[in-house]
């Protein structure tokens, strides 16, 4: 299977039913951002039966790399979410690190795997691959509602939760991130 060009993928804005609701729709979990942390969080919660709305103000995955090195613990979490091996297969694994000042090595560390560990200490992998693999996994998860071109523009604390104002290409809408139980029930 050839690599998907995740940098070239674009996601169309889709108007959501929440935008037509007469009262602010309620959600228990809203994740802001479809980067590595947001998608990992959404997948982990969704796998535990929690419905998650993911809002991202962009129309594409990352086109650069703000994150490029991922640790063993992150890989273990991604294993649990079904994408760990794919990340390792694509990335560059390493256990020994060296720090240089000009031509001189000033520090060296060795994080070779301990007995029973299945993953390398680190992998280097461009962020758009990490996001792409997580995105593909999230698309298969019925508990994740991923909304592109939805930007959180306002957050107001309320007695029963938090009111979010979300800007979209078709105008703003509001939803309630509620505490349980909500007095608005």
Show which residues each predicted segment covers:
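N-terminal Rossmann-like FAD-binding beta1-loop-alpha1 element of flavoenzymes
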Residues: 28-54
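Extreme N-terminal leader/targeting segments of oxidoreductases
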Residues: 1-29, 47-48
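Active-site-adjacent segment of FAD-dependent monooxygenases/related oxidoreductases
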Residues: 71-137
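Conserved small/polar residues in nucleotide/adenosyl-binding loops
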Residues: 178-185
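Residue-level detector of alpha-helix initiation sites
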Residues: 35-36, 61, 65
